[in-house]
Amino acid sequence: MKNFIVLFFIASCLIAVTCSKEKKSERFKLLTTPVWATDSLLANGVDASGPGGILEKFKGDAKFKEDGTGTFGKYEGDWRFNSEETEITIITDSLPIPIICKIVLLTIQDLKVTASVQNPANLQEILNLRLTFKAK
């Protein structure tokens, strides 16, 4: 009888630990499942993905990995959601400050984010960025 009680206790603990693991949200799955190909990269409404453009190095594929790391065009770094999963913060050693992006659209096929950042060429100017991606 003692063995049964001990086994029951151990099984209950294992079930409790397994069930208490945080499940991944739908938005987390939508963001981390595909590889995202850039569709448009705009700064103040103008294409900024060409040679010399402010977003040139973001051009290409973006992959948000489940472990919080990722690639964003030519950049590598970390990413995280805010608590409401309405913003993504991208942190990379290649940029002087983290970029906080507001999620405008996130579906199985489309990702659209916006951000406001200082223009590195003129710190008095704010650039309004809009980055759109399509799932590969």
Predicted regions and their residues:
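Bacterial Sec-dependent N-terminal signal peptides
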Residues: M1-K29
